């Protein structure tokens, strides 16, 4: 019997970086949690809260998932052993998960986008999203929907406030 997937967000997770533009530019279909292979100075830099997922994306090469364009600045106490800030980093997932993702990406014209980078139990994890790119009209519709929802909640707040006064 297969194990149930763990919830990605736990209360004891220390979030290092989030990719806020990903939710604006993509329709998120599914999320996955993956480990990441890092050097020691990268982990130390992440513990200082320094990272940027702004232009990051994941690719599948030879059955392995690689995170590209993740910017982790050099550790300021590091010496000649410091890492390259934008090097490609290998993501750690089970073979079945990788094969499943490859099939979905190939069939549905989808992409893998990192949503957040966080520590859980002393290990660095990446929340990956299987996503489809939004077009300009989709973004406008989402913005209009959010504005309408905000207006409804504002009006409800006014009515409740008027009843209690």
UniProtKB/Swiss-Prot annotation:
Family indicated by similarity: Belongs to the SmpB family.
Biased composition, class Basic and acidic residues, residue ranges: 135-158
Keyword match Amino-acid biosynthesis: no
Subcellular location: Cytoplasm
Region annotation Disordered: where it falls in the sequence: 135-165
GO CC terms in record: cytosol
Pfam families: SmpB
NCBIfam families for this protein: PRK05422.1, smpB
Biological role: Required for rescue of stalled ribosomes mediated by trans-translation. Binds to transfer-messenger RNA (tmRNA), required for stable association of tmRNA with ribosomes. tmRNA and SmpB together mimic tRNA shape, replacing the anticodon stem-loop with SmpB. tmRNA is encoded by the ssrA gene; the 2 termini fold to resemble tRNA(Ala) and it encodes a 'tag peptide', a short internal open reading frame. During trans-translation Ala-aminoacylated tmRNA acts like a tRNA, entering the A-site of stalled ribosomes, displacing the stalled mRNA.
GO biological processes: trans-translation
Keywords: Cytoplasm, RNA-binding
Protein name in the entry: SsrA-binding protein
GO molecular function: RNA binding
């Amino acid at each position: 019997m297969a194990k149930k997937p763990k919830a990605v967000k736990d209360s004891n997770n220390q979030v290092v970086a989030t990719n806020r533009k990903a939710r604006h530019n993509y329709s998120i279909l599914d999320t996955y949690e993956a480990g990441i292979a890092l050097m020691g100075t990268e982990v130390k830099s992440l513990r200082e809260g320094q990272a940027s997922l702004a232009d990051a994306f994941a690719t599948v090469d030879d059955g392995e998932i690689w995170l590209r364009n993740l910017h982790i600045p050099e550790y300021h106490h590091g010496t000649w052993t410091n890492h390259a800030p934008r090097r490609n980093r290998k993501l750690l997932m089970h073979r079945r998960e990788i094969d499943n993702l490859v099939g979905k990406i190939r069939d549905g014209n989808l992409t893998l986008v990192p949503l957040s980078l966080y520590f859980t139990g002393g290990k660095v994890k990446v929340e990956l999203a299987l996503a489809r790119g939004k077009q300009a009209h989709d973004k406008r519709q989402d913005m209009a929907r959010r504005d309408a929802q905000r207006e409804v909640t504002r009006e409800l707040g006014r009515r409740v406030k008027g009843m209690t006064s």
